């Protein structure tokens, strides 16, 4: 059977755990979504998609260089013991789960996680030349790379998951 699955948007909950460094303040304006589109469970190819997101930072006084670590938290829908190394989207009408993964740098590269439970954080040097409450906008990493492995035996439907992005000094 050739079941095409409408993969719901994977929402990366950007309730960013704000940076707690003395005078540095960072936020994630808006949300980030990763839409895998239709999934063909008979295909022998991975389903790969990517997206970027931006972070806004300001500092009092401005003009400093900082290094931030960006962590992606565990899957809220995974039933695995390690919800980072085994992320799962859940069917919105039944108990089916579809395994996927998020990477930094490239598809199938380093798992983007929290550096504690699993995966690695992404570190980025920034220059904050804007005094608070203004902001300097920069792009964190070039992309989040998402991959669904081929030939997963799941029912047709809409699948979704959410996780939290944390920005750490």
Give names to the regions the model predicted.
Residues 71-75, 101-105, 113-115:
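Predominantly extracellular/luminal cell-surface or secreted proteins
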Residues 2-10, 21:
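Sec-dependent signal peptide recognition
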Residues 21-95, 128-169:
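N-terminal small/polar-rich segments of proteins
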């Amino acid at each position: 059977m050739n079941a095409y699955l409408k993969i719901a948007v994977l929402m990366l909950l950007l309730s960013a755990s704000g940076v707690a460094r003395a005078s540095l303040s960072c936020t994630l304006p808006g949300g980030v979504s990763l839409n895998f589109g239709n999934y063909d469970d008979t295909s022998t190819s991975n389903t790969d998609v990517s997206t970027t997101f931006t972070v806004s930072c300001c500092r009092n006084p401005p003009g400093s260089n900082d290094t931030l670590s960006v962590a992606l938290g565990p899957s809220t829908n995974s039933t695995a013991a390690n919800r980072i190394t085994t992320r799962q989207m859940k069917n919105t009408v039944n108990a089916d789960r579809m395994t996927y993964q998020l990477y930094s740098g490239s598809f199938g590269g380093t798992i983007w996680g929290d550096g504690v439970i699993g995966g690695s954080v992404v570190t980025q040097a920034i220059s904050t030349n804007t005094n608070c409450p203004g902001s300097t906008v920069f792009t964190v990493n070039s992309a989040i790379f998402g991959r669904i492995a081929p030939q997963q035996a799941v029912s047709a439907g809409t699948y979704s998951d959410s996780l939290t992005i944390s920005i750490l000094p």
